[in-house]
């Protein structure tokens, strides 16, 4: 943590093709070893597959998928009186998008299709239909928060 003041968040530039900051953030999550061109080509190919399979605008399908993946509640561990409690807290908007993108990419990587663009496209389509592993992860997180609702009064 810095000793001198607060570190400001740097804003990402909007994507040149879809003019969306969310798409740029997805490219950044896809990127491995700084290979941005490779990550963006994977994403654009995935969006083409999404358009072919659904017949809808890929950005709309992606935003729908993100709305279905982003968590509203999560649990955070807090030590009270010698024991750890899982306390449900609301997720801040910035963290919601970060978690949604992280889960979407990580569960796309775990899929069994041949290429990464196919995996990502199918995960986006599944998430927009409220199915798929990323949506299941969100449901698990919400279920944990619901199960620990008794500790909500501790607050973080």
Curated annotation (Swiss-Prot):
<keyword id="KW-0699">rRNA-binding</keyword>
<dbReference type="GO" id="GO:0006412">
    <property type="term" value="P:translation"/>
</dbReference>
<keyword id="KW-0694">RNA-binding</keyword>
<dbReference type="InterPro" id="IPR023798">
    <property type="entry name" value="Ribosomal_uS7_dom"/>
</dbReference>
<dbReference type="InterPro" id="IPR036823">
    <property type="entry name" value="Ribosomal_uS7_dom_sf"/>
</dbReference>
<comment type="similarity">
    <text>Belongs to the universal ribosomal protein uS7 family.</text>
</comment>
<dbReference type="InterPro" id="IPR020606">
    <property type="entry name" value="Ribosomal_uS7_CS"/>
</dbReference>
<dbReference type="Pfam" id="PF00177">
    <property type="entry name" value="Ribosomal_S7"/>
</dbReference>
<dbReference type="GO" id="GO:0019843">
    <property type="term" value="F:rRNA binding"/>
</dbReference>
<comment type="subunit">
    <text>Part of the 30S ribosomal subunit. Contacts proteins S9 and S11.</text>
</comment>
<keyword id="KW-0689">Ribosomal protein</keyword>
<dbReference type="GO" id="GO:0000049">
    <property type="term" value="F:tRNA binding"/>
</dbReference>
<dbReference type="GO" id="GO:0015935">
    <property type="term" value="C:small ribosomal subunit"/>
</dbReference>
<protein>
    <recommendedName>
        <fullName>Small ribosomal subunit protein uS7</fullName>
    </recommendedName>
</protein>
<dbReference type="InterPro" id="IPR000235">
    <property type="entry name" value="Ribosomal_uS7"/>
</dbReference>
<keyword id="KW-0687">Ribonucleoprotein</keyword>
<dbReference type="InterPro" id="IPR005717">
    <property type="entry name" value="Ribosomal_uS7_bac/org-type"/>
</dbReference>
<keyword id="KW-0820">tRNA-binding</keyword>
<dbReference type="GO" id="GO:0003735">
    <property type="term" value="F:structural constituent of ribosome"/>
</dbReference>
<comment type="function">
    <text>One of the primary rRNA binding proteins, it binds directly to 16S rRNA where it nucleates assembly of the head domain of the 30S subunit. Is located at the subunit interface close to the decoding center, probably blocks exit of the E-site tRNA.</text>
</comment>
């Amino acid at each position: 943590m810095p000793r001198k003041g607060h570190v400001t968040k740097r804003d990402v530039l909007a994507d040149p093709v879809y003019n969306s900051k969310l798409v740029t953030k997805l490219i950044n999550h896809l990127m491995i070893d700084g290979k941005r061109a490779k990550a963006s080509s994977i994403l654009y190919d995935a969006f083409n597959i999404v358009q072919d399979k659904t017949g809808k605008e890929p950005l709309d399908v992606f935003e729908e998928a993100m709305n279905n993946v982003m968590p509203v509640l999560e649990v955070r561990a807090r030590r009270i009186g010698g024991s750890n409690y899982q306390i449900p807290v609301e997720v801040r908007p910035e963290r919601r998008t970060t978690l949604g993108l992280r889960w979407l990419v990580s569960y796309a990587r775990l899929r069994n299709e041949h290429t990464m663009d196919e995996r990502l496209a199918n995960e986006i389509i599944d998430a927009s239909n409220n199915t798929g592993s990323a949506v299941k992860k969100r449901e698990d997180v919400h279920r944990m928060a619901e199960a620990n609702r008794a500790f909500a009064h501790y607050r973080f």
